[in-house]
């Protein structure tokens, strides 16, 4: 199965294992809660999936790479205890609590989340001394003499033997006690994730043209050459930062992430062209509605991969504006909700307390900050959600400064000042939305003039549809031409599907 399907199965499993009956007991007893065993090549996204599932299910996550541990840290350290058995004093060996079990309790204490996921990675690559402990863990859900706490779902991951020389096969007794999921790389599924994760547009465009280079692991006389989904994502983060800093990524740098020489060389050449197209075609000018006439003449002679790269660059520019609009909208909505609570709280502040409104507002901000840090520690905030909260905190602290400088005479004056500050924020949101809409209209103007209803327009409209950022913007703000092209595209797909059905029907009847 692909990683998206695996994520859905894990999410459903967590919900099922943590479901309770009318008496408050777990509907599926712990003994029947089979651990999940994910088997797949390295760098496919198994660890990230666990973070997403924990966040979406609202539970804690404790993750360990078991190859980093010894038997002592997994089982605990031995110590001597005096016991009396049958009237005879004896010395017996007992063990301290496993570091892994202790970390679960520490996580529960730090996050106040009593249920969660224990994720053990590379479980089939452990040393010979630790292998029996891992079998006991999967079969009995214990480390040494300590059981995994109730309400914690066990998920383990490993690599097939063709990817790791240290792999140990599980026996049938162990496999009969787990739920095994075999995961394979899937570019279309990864691209869905990549769009939401804002993977660099050059990488998405390159993989659109060269899908065979998405994931490869090849062994030859020179060693193992590989490229993984993790490598592409990590490279994307670096490219974004390099662009911000005005630095250039060369082939040597790319080889550090894409450890497949031919693919690294190919992508490096493509990246150079990608930046060249951005400058030569003037993408920012296109999105400002000021495309140069020479651009259209050049496109008439350009090969398909160059035209597709330009479409990707235009989509990237739009995505940046859609993201800014979405972020401004999210910050404004959060601040509005915060002010509603502020209005209620101000009603309880006595008018005769000096600076009472500002102190109350300060305490509200402190509570919001503490809540943010608690959610962050628990892993319950996505990257976008955390960014929104941090921006909201920055806005609120600015408002607090204005409130203190104004030295408002009463609670009503204080709220009027805050309401005025919010109007400025709402204006900024409107400006971001208008800028994104104007760029979208300019993009359609260019696409119609340059490509009309060709394959490039199909790619453009399709990407606007499947990208979650652009889809959300279009749903909220609309665009007449997008809806028209999307409608025509759907009609074309339905017509093609109908023609295929008719052709298949004719073949079944011998062409009669």
Protein language model features and the residues they cover:
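Conformational switch/transducer regions in large eukaryotic molecular machines and scaffolds
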Residues: 35-37, 57-68, 80, 89-116, ...
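AAA+ P-loop NTPase catalytic core and its hallmark functional loops
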Residues: 1-212, 220
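Conserved, well-structured beta-alpha core segment at the onset of a catalytic domain
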Residues: 25-34, 43-46, 242-257, 512
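Terminal-proximal interaction/regulatory segments of ATP-powered molecular machines
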Residues: 300-512
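Alpha-helical lid/collar subdomain of P-loop NTPases
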Residues: 196-355, 359
């Amino acid at each position: 199965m692909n990683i998206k399907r695996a994520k859905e199965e894990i999410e459903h499993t967590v919900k099922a294992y943590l479901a309770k009956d009318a008496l408050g007991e777990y509907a599926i007893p712990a003994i029947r809660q089979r651990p999940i065993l994910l088997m797949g090549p390295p760098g496919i996204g198994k660890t990230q999936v666990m973070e997403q599932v924990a966040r979406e299910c609202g539970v804690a996550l404790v993750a360990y790479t078991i190859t980093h541990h010894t038997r002592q840290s997994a089982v605990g350290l031995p110590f001597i205890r005096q016991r009396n058995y049958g009237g005879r004093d004896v010395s017996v060996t007992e063990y301290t609590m496993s570091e892994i079990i202790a970390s679960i309790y520490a996580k529960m204490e730090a996050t106040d989340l009593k249920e969660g996921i224990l994720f053990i990675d590379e479980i089939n690559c452990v040393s010979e001394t630790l292998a029996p402990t891992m079998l006991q863990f999967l079969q009995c859900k214990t480390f040494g003499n300590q059981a995994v706490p109730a309400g914690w779902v066990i998920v383990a991951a490993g690599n097939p033997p063709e990817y790791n020389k240290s792999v140990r096969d599980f026996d049938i007794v162990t496999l009969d006690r787990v739920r095994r999921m075999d995961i394979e790389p899937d570019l279309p599924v990864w691209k869905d994730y990549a769009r939401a994760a804002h993977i660099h547009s050059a990488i998405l465009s390159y993989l659109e043209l060269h899908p065979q280079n998405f994931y490869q692991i090849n062994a030859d006389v020179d060693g193992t050459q590989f490229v993984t989904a993790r490598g592409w994502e990590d490279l994307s983060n670096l490219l974004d930062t390099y662009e911000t800093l005005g630095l250039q990524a060369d082939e040597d740098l790319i080889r550090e992430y894409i450890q497949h020489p031919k693919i690294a060389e190919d992508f490096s050449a493509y990246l150079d062209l990608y930046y060249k197209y951005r400058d030569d075609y003037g993408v920012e000018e296109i999105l400002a509605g000021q495309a140069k006439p020479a651009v259209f003449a050049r496109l008439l002679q350009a090969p398909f991969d160059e035209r597709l790269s330009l479409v990707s660059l235009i989509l990237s520019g739009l995505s940046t504006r859609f993201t800014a609009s979405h972020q401004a909208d999210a910050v404004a909505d959060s601040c509005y909700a915060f002010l509603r609570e502020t209005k209620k709280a101000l009603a309880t502040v006595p008018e005769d307390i000096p600076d009472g409104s500002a102190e109350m507002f300060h305490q509200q901000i402190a509570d919001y900050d503490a809540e943010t840090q608690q959610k962050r520690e628990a892993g319950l905030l996505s990257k976008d959600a955390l960014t929104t909260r941090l921006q909201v905190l920055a806005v609120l602290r600015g408002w607090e400064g204005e409130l203190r400088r104004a030295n408002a005479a009463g609670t009503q004056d204080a709220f009027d000042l805050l309401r005025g500050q919010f109007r400025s924020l709402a204006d900024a949101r409107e400006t971001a939305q208008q800028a994104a809409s104007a760029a979208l209209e300019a993009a359609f103007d260019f696409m119609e003039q340059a490509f009309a209803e060709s394959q490039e327009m199909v790619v453009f409209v399709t990407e606007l549809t499947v990208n979650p950022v652009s889809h959300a913007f279009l749903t909220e703000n609309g665009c007449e031409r997008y809806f028209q092209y999307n409608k025509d595209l759907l009609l074309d797909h339905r017509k093609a599907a109908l023609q295929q059905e008719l052709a298949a029907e004719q073949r079944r009847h011998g062409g009669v």
